[in-house]
Amino acid sequence: MSSKRRAYPQPSYTNGPGSQLGTPPVAGGFQQPNYGVDQLNQQFQGMNVDPNQAAVAGAPQAAAGSPYGYNQYQQPGANANAAHQSRAGNAAGASSYYLQQGNINAALPLNQLYTTDLSRELPPPISDLSLPPPPIVLPAGTTLIPNSETANAQPEYFRSTLNVIPTNSSLLKKSKLPLALVVKPYNALKVEQEDVPVTSDTTISRCRRCRGYINPFVTLAENGRRWRCNFCNLLNDIPSSFEYDEISGTVKNKFDRVELNNAVVEFIAPKEYMARAPQPIVYTFIIDVSINAVQSGLTGTITRTILESLDRIPNKTKTARVAFIGVDSNLHYFRFNEGLDGTEVLIVSDIDEPFLPSPDGLLVNLDENRQAVEKLLIDFPSYFEDTANQGFALGPALKSGHKMISHIGGKLVCFSATLPNIGEGKLSVRDEASVSGKPKEAKTLLSSADSFYKSFAVNCNSSQISVDLFLTSSSYQDVATLSNLPRFTAGQSHFYPAWTSAKNEDVTKLSKEVSDHLSQDIALEAVLRVRGSTGIRMSSFYGNFFNRSSDLCSFPTFPRDQSYVIEMSIEENINKPVVYFQAAVLHSTSFGERRIRVMNLAIPTSSKLNDIYASADQLAITNIFTHKAIETALSSSLPDARDFLVNKVVDILNVYKKELVAGNVSGASPLQLSTNLRMLPILLFSLTKHLGFRADRVPSDHRAAALNNLGSLPIPYLVKYIYPTVYALHTMPDECGLPEKLIQVNEETGEEEEVISTNIMLPEPINDSKSSWENYGLYLIDNSSELFLWVSGNVVPGLVQDLFGTDNLYAIPTGKTELPEFSDEESEFNFRVRQIIGKIRENNDSIVWKNLYVVVGGSSNEPIEISQQRDLMALRMWAYSCLVEDKTGSEPSYRDFLTNLKTKVSQ
């Protein structure tokens, strides 16, 4: 095998009318939008700034005079790929997305409206999916600290669907755009991976009337002795500790306070914010020990994974507690005897009225009982290796777990390979064949089959208990019903269909995800409240939690890998140039501190529809429409949910054509839309073809699991889940798959020098369409859950040799597998592809481990025994379903979808 880089054949493209291929790439790989002549002629007509007016001092030209995504997003070439991967370090840091204007008169120049004809932008410019939202442009003096670059929250934490807020409800209604906030309070699984500033004392200054927290947008009065609330306008006293430290006797500068400088901040809470002292972190593991779980290897894999993860459980204060319950048709408790290494197994067979068989020793301190816990986890599988018990009494086990930890709170972590089939909460297999593909499918198969699970979940929430599910059965498990447990307790459902320990890749995925799940620095006993300026009301809440009151969301434990959406309504006319939003999470940390994480957002207002459209965030809009489509599917039907998504696109296009197309020219294309929204139609179209909504027959467990993911994924993962990312590996540049080279200035010499970073360069994505493919290519598909490596049927033999170590295409392993590992010297191409896969799998804000599926495409030379392999055919169809721009099954292509839209909008 040669390590020499091969020159693989390059695909040749024909640049048709309106092709994006002729557009020069922007540094860093983001493609410059391609505008037609007709649009360029309309640019000044669409401006909301007088073209004769001089540029406003302090206003970046990208926001006032260039197309969305052009000058604003040109990043330095060396580090551009990382430019939009900002994490917590940028949470309160400098941002080019939030701008303050200087010397503003009456008219505030906001983002400019540019029009795109969707029918002329095929294939759609997918580089837009990597861009941040349109900038938020604030008037001068909005922030207490002049020209602060850290006052507004980064979109990774807190973003709005509209970065200009309508001044009245009629304008919002007229726009057909949703008004909602997307909140993701945490952006890494571990505390140390974030850089959110924390107050140095327990002084918390809040408005006496609206209870808003002091923030970078307040104003000072009476020589700095009082602050005026930016939410309700009330004057409040500045705490004396802001200016004088009584302990050290030193004078302080109040303008140095982190809460006055940063959009995202954590307050250390005093005792009055505690209903009780912060509780220890608690994990009660409910483990399926029935014959299904034992034979599939779940029981052994989980106990080994927990054993290997004990050091990763957050336990800085040495107070973490654990308990274990084995479940078949009986409940098997494990009592730890103080001072002894061993444990007792206590079996309760009365599942109708389950009870705790011992008053102590069931829930124990992990640190103090470490040896006994380790021994139990080593011996655990042997207790059940000869079982023939087919029962699984999940309901009674949950009630026992609740009884065990209800005085403290914590987590019930359930591992199941069996449908609950005995005791309270018993479920049965539903008749899918009779309703699949019919309007009543959702209500019959996706609704809860037993009210126990929701009512129990609500009880858990009030007891500060979260429930997490890891479901691994190869047969029906009723994910739709069971997912009520995590949905109302701020947990999550994890679904592993046909899982078996005989497959190393299955074991790797489950083990990594469980281990990362246990290692999260979760917050405990948390509540989320979002407040807005006068005239704005929080009307609907979406995500995994329970609404304790009209505006208070309750989280027994607060996960770090989910996001939440709050829909808003405008109750009163807004007569101020800026409105404010504040999200606050009161919680206990895993290391025993009571804290409040506060996120602040200021957004300008306008009475002009073009301002609203020019600043709309297409990714946040996709997020809220996804939640509302799920709501429609569960309350009505899947066809209604798909119609909802299509109708939203039609409504928005109709408004744009009627109200915003320059001069409303007769005969103008009905598919014109603002450039910053040009990917919204394909995202909503792709959503109709998603596993959760598509019209084709889908097993109800798979559909329910997909809807669970759609309802909790943060925006970057949600977008990829809807519109998968595809990379062409056979044509990638030489630097892809290798560490990125950066140029930096040596502080001592002042000279530029090249530095090798740890960041792996990824290829530029291509469109989700076979028209972007070559029949001799190699493609990597990332759909946020799995990775597909597509090896085309006419692939170059040398490429197969370099990647797999054989030139026989049909000798390579297909299906769920891993690539052979060759060193850089043995095969540079293999090394680079594995580096790319490793980079895609690498994340610090999600526990998901993406399995790799190798798929060999068909060809005219394919042996008949290969073409008759049902598993391979199914695998090809699965991978093809990721190409959402193409016609798949009964679903139309994106081009056909646009044609249908044109008819509907023209009516």
Curated annotation (Swiss-Prot):
Annotated segments matching region Disordered: 1-34
Keyword Transport included in the entry's annotation: yes
GO molecular function (one): SNARE binding
GO BP annotations listed: COPII-coated vesicle cargo loading; intracellular protein transport
GO CC list: cis-Golgi network; COPII vesicle coat; endoplasmic reticulum exit site; endoplasmic reticulum membrane; equatorial cell cortex; Golgi membrane
Binding annotation for Zn(2+): C207, C210, C229, C232
Entry keywords, A to Z: Cytoplasm, Cytoplasmic vesicle, Endoplasmic reticulum, ER-Golgi transport, Golgi apparatus, Membrane, Metal-binding, Protein transport, Transport, Zinc
Protein origin, superkingdom: Eukaryota
Entry keyword annotation includes Thylakoid: no
Membrane topology summary: Peripheral membrane protein
Region described as Zinc finger-like: 207-232
Stored Pfam families: Gelsolin, Sec23_BS, Sec23_helical, Sec23_trunk, zf-Sec23_Sec24
Bias type Polar residues, positions: 11-22
Cellular compartments annotated: Cytoplasm; Cytoplasmic vesicle, COPII-coated vesicle membrane; Endoplasmic reticulum membrane; Golgi apparatus membrane
Broad class of the protein's primary localization: cytoplasm
Xref: InterPro entries: ADF-H/Gelsolin-like_dom_sf (IPR029006), Gelsolin-like_dom (IPR007123), Gelsolin-like_dom_sf (IPR036180), Sec23/24_helical_dom (IPR006900), Sec23/24_helical_dom_sf (IPR036175), Sec23/24_trunk_dom (IPR006896), Sec23_24_beta_S (IPR012990), SEC23_SEC24_subfamily (IPR050550)
Subunit description: The COPII coat is composed of at least 5 proteins: the SEC23/24 complex, the SEC13/31 complex, and the protein SAR1. Golgi apparatus membrane; Peripheral membrane protein; Cytoplasmic side.
Protein role: Component of the coat protein complex II (COPII) which promotes the formation of transport vesicles from the endoplasmic reticulum (ER). The coat has two main functions, the physical deformation of the endoplasmic reticulum membrane into vesicles and the selection of cargo molecules.
Family: Belongs to the SEC23/SEC24 family. SEC24 subfamily.
Name this protein carries in UniProt: Protein transport protein SEC24
Phylogenetic lineage: Eukaryota, Fungi, Dikarya, Ascomycota, Saccharomycotina
